[in-house]
Structures are given as structure tokens and as C-alpha cells.
Amino acid sequence: MVEWTDDERAIINSIFSTLDYEEIGRKSLCRCLIVYPWTQRYFGGFGNLYNAETILCNPLIAAHGTKILHGLDRALKNMDDIKNTYAELSQLHSDKLHVDPDNFRLLADCLTVVIAAKMGTAFTVETQVAWQKFLAVVVSALGRQYH
């Protein structure tokens, strides 16, 4: 079980309180698909992902990015039990969608870049430490059902 300090909880809650889920979700998922093009294979039903411009303008990608951020909101609300909170989602990505679990880390890295850019100087070292810890727990929970 992960131990969270009061400061870590406050930092993570503060980050989420300022997020525009639509903007940050879209930018993060688009960045992941553009920077790591092999991740596009999981989005075959999302239409044309031929180049960066089509990815950035794709409403299905934007909607899924928002959905991902709302999924992270579930982790925020269940910080003391992220593993069980994501058990079903982990199984879905493992058994049905066959997503390589390394892609969760890639998306988490892209999300961090987007949030850091948005927060600017407010994304301090202390903020990053708490944020990275949170995302590491989420990524671990999402990869838990893989064998």
C-alpha cells in the first residue's frame, strides 16, 4: 500500500483542481500518439491518424483524452486504494484491448509534459515529485492484471 503525505495529497488535489479535462486530456493523448506513433495501433477505429494535424483535429481522440482524465479523477478520489479502483480497467486493457502496459507510462509522461507546460513555474520540483508518484501508482495499477 502506498503512503501519501498530507503535502502530496494537497499537491495532487491542487493540480486536479486547475485542470481543464478537455484541453489537457486532448493534448496529452495527441502528444502520445504523435511522439510514439506505434501507440496509434490501439485507435484503429478512431479514423484517420495519418499525421499530426489529423490527430490534433480528431474529435474521437479529443473525447478519449477527456475520458482518460476522468479516469484519473477516479484515482484521485480513491488514492488509498488505486489498485482496486483500477482492477476492472486493468483487466479490460489486458484481456480485451490487448494494450501493451508500457503505453500507460508513455501516456503518463506525455500528461506530465502537458501539465508542466500549462503550470509553468508553479510546476516545482516538489510538485513533480508528488505528481510522478501519483502517476507511478496509477500506471502500476493499470498494469496489474497483465500476465
UniProtKB/Swiss-Prot annotation:
UniProt-recorded Gene Ontology molecular function terms: haptoglobin binding; heme binding; metal ion binding; organic acid binding; oxygen binding; oxygen carrier activity; peroxidase activity
GO BP annotation list: hydrogen peroxide catabolic process
Transmembrane domains' residue ranges: none
PROSITE patterns assigned: GLOBIN
Binding positions for heme b per the UniProt entry: 64, 93
PANTHER family according to UniProt: HEMOGLOBIN FAMILY MEMBER (PTHR11442), HEMOGLOBIN SUBUNIT EPSILON (PTHR11442:SF7)
Name of the protein described by the UniProt record: Hemoglobin subunit beta
Source organism per UniProt: Merlangius merlangus (Whiting)
Gene: hbb
